[in-house]
């Protein structure tokens, strides 16, 4: 008959209704009117072919999201899957058991806790090396506040990522992290350099006892690992600069348009609701003169008897007495500063020497 399941049960319900009113002899199925959906444009089918033919191929949900982001064409995962099966472009994916619903603990306020983690993975196509994705997600709203790729996980990459994200969104009360040496020291009264930078601006560290305890950020890693490499392969993006440019476009789209399964709404809508209900503890990034030096790798250097300090493979004169101790600050962008003393909220920075990277 060529009827779909939904149409069949609709007719069956109408027939039973007619029988209940003694009108079975006069009942007729009528006409459905046919398929009113217009054919997909050439641009839509071309983009779908590109995304589903790449190695690895994009998932159906990722392809539907890209149609909306790039072409403004809104469809669902099921329609993309049906088109892919008809055109022999279905990715060869194994059956996965549907996840069981789990009620997870979460904080109440926007900005109370951000889950933070790094994901080493072969993000770039045709690359033998692994790159690192640094990722931040708000625990209350699932708002992905930041995601950026780096060649490796270093102290400078953490400084660069966190300072960017804090300037864009503000300062949370705490970060939820693991026991990596970047965050944790066995002395409870001491800070790592990264911990000291966070403490300077009132951001605490909370430690997850197991990887499973950081489930929200781990699932976000899985989301990016399934979505980003196929898109990079489809667009032939082979460098970190281009990959981060694509991430800057994907991140707001995911926050604003993709429904989160546990929340039943988009992270953007969840954040707006928290703001409306005055459930926000996020603080704006301060206009602090110490900001570029707090987010830098600092070491203490002794001025030589010649009144000079090392700068790369050279020695430069500095406005400090010989044999005195100064603070060397290496910025993520490569700029080098020498300060008279370490960051102190009760004082202002005194720059003794600045050596730009260019």
Regions found by a protein language model. Give the residues of each.
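Charged alpha-helix within mobile-element recombinases
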Residues: 194-284, 332
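Double-stranded DNA-binding cores of transcription factors and transposases
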Residues: 1-15
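Mobile-element integrase/transposase regions
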Residues: 73, 84-137, 143-144, 155-164, ...
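Mobile genetic element proteins and their domesticated derivatives, centered on retroelements
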Residues: 8-11, 48, 63, 80, ...
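Basic, flexible linker segments flanking DNA-binding modules
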Residues: 13-122, 270-275
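A short acidic/small-residue loop/turn micro-motif
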Residues: 138-139, 150-154, 358
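Acidic/histidine-rich, metal-coordinating catalytic segments
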Residues: 166-188, 208-211
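C-terminal, beta-rich DNA-binding module of retroviral/retroelements integrases
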Residues: 251-358
